[in-house]
């Protein structure tokens, strides 16, 4: 039976915890997954593509979107604005897709408040703060000051782990991929996603097998 609506999977956690790498596997395996492309005011990193990784806009344009109630959720992080379009999310849910968000703690709260029954959330982290810092250095996209800021922000994020449904400590990428895929498939199997009355009616319409006692 087809789902009557889609589901939401929220991924949060410190920058450098491996969310992007895990997402790549998720989208290879879950064919009807839809990545919610955020709008941001930050400068594009090398290799990032407009419309694929982010929608890049000016601060003025973003603030206009806030005024026009364009965003489902938005937040200011490290001096930059990030937000999610309402229209694109509603459209994907109507098509029965798994809508995947890579957003911060406040964004998770906003999504959970808007779609409490459809949302499954996962907090992804490294085993230690030191490993997080090492990954950020190896990534080579930020200077020391920015890395220090990201690690400091990670301390704040770690305090909110209890707000999430699942936690993945990303020690081993392959094992973490398996965990995330299991969670994603479970999210798509929630009872709330199905028209239960139609399911039961269809089940009842089938001929009931006779048992020895019914003869």
From Swiss-Prot:
- Where does this protein hold ATP? 13-20
* One term of GO molecular function: ATP binding
Task: Return the CDD domains for the record.
Answer: GMPK
> What coarse category fits the chief subcellular location reported for this protein?
cytoplasm
Q: Where in the cell is it found?
A: Cytoplasm
For the Guanylate kinase-like domain, which residue ranges apply?
Answer: 6-185
Reactions catalysed: GMP + ATP = GDP + ADP
Q: Which GO cellular component does the record give, naming just one?
A: cytosol
The EC designation for this entry is 2.7.4.8
Keywords of the record, alphabetical order, are: ATP-binding, Cytoplasm, Kinase, Nucleotide-binding, Transferase
**EC category name:** transferase
Q: What does this protein do?
A: Essential for recycling GMP and indirectly, cGMP.
The family line of this record is: Belongs to the guanylate kinase family.
From the Swiss-Prot or TrEMBL record, give the protein name: Guanylate kinase
